[in-house]
């Protein structure tokens, strides 16, 4: 439910950000929207569609996964669908005329870890939201690669830092409140030594206390727009951070 098409977030994406010039007094390229007001109105119905895949090294469709849309703070789902054989889903969400602050909940009868996908900003237009799920075995391998020992009952948040155009941002640092163990990718895999995002913009916040978590990022000297997600115990929460 983000403003741009993307795959969230443990997908191994390598994107090189294009360099462009700007006036020395103007905003840093890619951060022109920093601080701009968010939309306050939305069409009566917005559609969220995409593909659910699994297997980090070779993503493949996940059929028969349950995808439900919720408004934050409300346990009644707004819309739902089941992925088809190619892993596609589509949910139409009634907005009431205002952007929807909510999330997607994705599950597939225990074959993969339950996953929750949050937008960087409230949903005010149709979007494509592709979600990559991981199995418990894959999660353990990824955690080991990052030098993390998962704590039972802890939350895990995967983040992609993007600029105003939706391109992943390299060199960003991510923090949260409450704090967790932060890691980044290097060479397309979680690293125990990387200190900022690679070209894929990916960061991980592990062993964070379950409940509401504020996620933040700094990139190119800019503090990006922070927002709150709910990190469920022993589940995966996915989100993006944008200016």
Q: Which residues does each predicted region cover?
A:
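Beta-strand-rich domain onsets/edges
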Residues: 25-47, 127-156, 165
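Bacterial N-terminal signal peptides that target proteins for export
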Residues: 1-9
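Hydrophobic beta-strand segments
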Residues: 64-72, 172-176
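Structural motif
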Residues: 42-66, 160-169
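Short, low-hydrophobicity acidic/polar segments
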Residues: 80, 86-149
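Short, acidic Ser/Thr/Gly-rich low-complexity loop/linker segments typical of extracellular
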Residues: 71-94, 178-204
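Structured interaction patches on ligand/partner-binding surfaces of diverse proteins
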Residues: 107-134, 208-212, 218-243
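C-terminal motif of bacterial Sec signal peptides marking the signal peptidase cleavage site
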Residues: 16-19
